[in-house]
């Protein structure tokens, strides 16, 4: 009987590895540009109860505009690499998980300006970083556990900070917000 009770204990800690891909929405100067957002991550989940848990982890995310950009010819599309640290509260209902929380993002590969037009005042920005090295967003997510170890889901990142880096030049700098929506496939270890 003691062996049966030992195996019946609920798991407090869960390890997850996941990949995600989807749509990047780069909102700048009042217009939207779209691109691709891709992510590889690890999450450590701590279960408080059968219904509630908190998950944190690390993910590498690439946001690239140039795959679908209308600025492909003669303009400057964006391409960034981030280290993301999510902190999500999660509610578990049968096979479904619903999560919400902040994501702290550190830009580890920043894109720089490349303006081709010689008559543009923005050519002074050439070679300078486009965005700030840190920002945070809000991440809602929904997951469906297809088995004990595999899950599918959808998550989004809603950028809450203006990430545009400004310089001391006599030109206007607009606001830039990064958002994405991704499909996620994960393995619970």
Model segments located where?
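Membrane-embedded beta-strands of outer-membrane beta-barrel proteins
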Residues: 40-42, 85-87, 98, 140-142, ...
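Short glycine/proline- and aromatic-enriched beta-strand/turn motifs that initiate or cap beta-hairpins
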Residues: 8-47, 54, 186-188
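Residues that define the transmembrane beta-barrel architecture of outer-membrane proteins
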Residues: 11-13, 32-38, 79-83, 94, ...
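Transmembrane beta-strands of outer-membrane beta-barrel pores
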Residues: 21-27, 60-64, 93-95, 104-110, ...
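Flexible, solvent-exposed loop segments that connect beta-strands
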Residues: 27-31, 62-81, 108-134, 162-176
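Hydrophobic h-region of N-terminal signal peptides that target proteins for export
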Residues: 1-8
